[in-house]
Amino acid sequence: METQASPKDEVAEAVELELEAVIGFNGHVPTGLKCHPDQEHLVYPLGCTILIQAINTQEQNFLHGHGNNVSCVAISKSGLYIASGQVTFMGFKADIILWDYKKRELMARLSLHKGKIEALAFSPNDMYLVSLGGPDDGSVVVWSIAKREAICGSPAAGLNVGNATTVIFSKCRDEMFVTAGNGTIRVWELDLPNRKIWPTECQTGQMKRIVMSISMANDDSFFYLGTTTGDILKMNPRTKLLADTGPAKDKFSLGVSAICCLKMGGLLVGSGDGLLVFCKSPSYKPIKKIQLQGGITSITLRGEGHQFFVGTEESHIYRVNFTNFKETLITTCHFESVEDIVFPFGTAELFATCAKKDIRVWHTLTNRELLRITVPNMTCHGIDFMRDGKSIISAWDDGRIRAFAPETGRLMYVINNAHRIGVTAIATTSDCKRVISGGGEGEVRVWHIGHQTQKLEEALKEHKSSVSCIRVKKSNEECVTASTDGTCIIWDLVRLRRNQMILANTLFQCVCYHPEEFQIITSGTDRKIAYWEVFDGSVIRELDGSLSGAVNGMDITVEGVHFVTGGNDHLVKVWDYNEGEVTHVGVGHSGNITRIRISPGNQYIVSVSADGAILRWKYPFPS
């Protein structure tokens, strides 16, 4: 928890950065994507934040308040309240936050559960909120929304069964709800005068099932349970008996991970392998179906369900019209750690990011994905645009350098076996004739790029460990490489040999030339930002870059007046270069920041993080 406590001291004297946009969606949260009852907004989690995204415009609102990743989200039937739960460390209290939707602010913080909040549900008339604790907690608690306090609690499952993982309220009565999980299905009655909840175990006979998802019919006649086996159970909440199960054959692959009842009858079912199906009881055979990318974790209706939204584990949000059952991808993002971000030379209109198995090009103002280049089962560690804009050069962990056309994503050429233990860093010269790459074994290699050929000019062997960052001087006669062996080396690119070496007791993660190119700034795991003389490699000054974690990314403006840093303390910091003071701090990331860039023309700062999020900030000074 120390990473959450310490940033407050630094934020005190610095001005807060203005967050303009977030590209990101945590698709791993079960039923995390919700369509608000006003039918104009989507609500979904990203790290510790909850995003309220307007469906028809680019407008976004952010709910900040959780100290750790959000694990569940619920919206009341009236749309007045949003509730969200989080995970935390073992033995610590995990908070539930009740938000006022209209004012977009925190109303109450409800703390009782330990470790994790598994699921949340509102009663139909906004009277109660029921919460389910995680495996270390195992309790179910009913909260009064008016008084904002707990009414009563109870262990969620019996002694000889597994944990309960899902909860749903009755659609008509404020006193009944259902919990289900590993081998347990319970219907609960709330007894308000005695402040107790009474469970009744549902009988499924010989069937033993682990419940993944749950949905209640509009008139409370039945509720449906999706299981890891890939079938659906239909239960009667009054008799607590099994009505029917299905499908008998062709069960849903990787389990029924999302389920949703429609008012007109029938079910929408999402499976763990990305199949979206419309089916009806009792056969549960697919009437309509489409295949989506990534396991489906959320299905949420817009209004009565003529249109609905689907969220998948690969951070895709689809809009589907029920009548023609065709999907439209409306939001997408990286679902793994983003390794690098880069702007093309001289334009801030678009930028590229890379992560596991793909490179994506984004339109800056609309947050739209323009292009996706996929290389299956590989991780891209670094990218750079050639100065002429004709190719994107990328560094991959299979030891290859790949070049792609930025408009089409066509593979232009591959340099095989560029490095032994993967390519970890890459840079290009401004005359577009050379590519400089760094590898996991510590070699720095200079490649000559011709019209049809790619030739190795020199392998520079000095570093003992992986190269983390490469920057080239404007004149293309010199470059600096930072390595995790604790050295930064300045190379002469004309004679292809070492000019100067900088030693420090740290794993260097990032390096920048000052625009006047007589100084460099470095940072890394010792949290210090150091200024060095290029000429003799002597240290000029050291600043404390962060109080709590490594600094992973850094970029400097063209004028050299300000620079930005980001790292494991999840904060974006803008620094005055000469004073060495933090002028602005950006709070919003919930994963470790991996890389950060200032756009050409100093309009935006774009930072990327290990949870797959891309954040765009307004550059605080007039350009």
Curated annotation (Swiss-Prot):
InterPro entries: WD40/YVTN_repeat-like_dom_sf, WD40_repeat_CS, WD40_repeat_dom_sf, WD40_rpt, WD_repeat_EMAP. It is found in: Cytoplasm, Cytoskeleton, Cilium axoneme; Cytoplasm; Cytoplasm, Cytoskeleton, Flagellum axoneme. PROSITE patterns: WD_REPEATS_1, WD_REPEATS_2, WD_REPEATS_REGION. WD repeats lie at residues 65-109, 112-153, 159-198, 291-330, 333-372, 375-414, 418-457, 462-501, 503-544, 546-585, 588-623. SUPFAM superfamilies: WD40 repeat-like. One of its GO terms (cellular component) is axonemal microtubule. The keyword Cytoplasm applies. GO terms for biological process: flagellated sperm motility. Keywords: Cell projection, Cilium, Cytoplasm, Cytoskeleton, Flagellum, Repeat, WD repeat. Its main location: cytoplasm. Expressed in trachea multiciliated cells. The keyword Magnesium does not apply. PANTHER family: CILIA- AND FLAGELLA-ASSOCIATED PROTEIN 52, WD-40 REPEAT PROTEIN. Microtubule inner protein component of sperm flagellar doublet microtubules. Interacts with BRCA2. Interacts with the CCT chaperonin complex. Interacts with HSP70. Interacts with AK8. Interacts with CFAP45. Interacts with DNAI1. Interacts with IQDC. Belongs to the CFAP52 family. Microtubule inner protein (MIP) part of the dynein-decorated doublet microtubules (DMTs) in cilia axoneme. Important for proper ciliary and flagellar beating. May act in cooperation with CFAP45 and axonemal dynein subunit DNAH11. May play a role in cell growth and/or survival. This is Cilia- and flagella-associated protein 52.
